[in-house]
């Protein structure tokens, strides 16, 4: 029986950051793109994930406000490696979405980097992607999503 796979729901447009990039640079990426998670990549390998929630948690709430002080602006200079999640749970593109969902629930994560056979990132699957698939297909394993290949 055919099942919905991660490669039918994952985002393949990857925007990555490096561990030595600043939170200011990450903020610009989040402002420019409609992502909630960025992969932190070094030498073509995923070394971490940073989310928009991580960014908000580590930036001063006064950045960009009239009451901003030097120490508030300094939070923009913090490095990604200081705040990223390091224990990254990854997945393969040919994994079914039920297993992806179990991995997210078991590990308490909201995204899974999708890696190829060389362990290089080729996409990201998020809880939103999985929820959209269920909303569109229900539990029908033969369902085809509008943007899926095959």
Predicted regions mapped to residue ranges:
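Tandem CBS (Bateman) regulatory domains
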Residues: 1-13, 51-89, 96, 101-105, ...
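The conserved cystathionine-beta-synthase
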Residues: 17-34, 40-42, 81, 90-108, ...
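A glycine-centered beta-loop-beta connector
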Residues: 30-33, 38-54, 104, 112-128
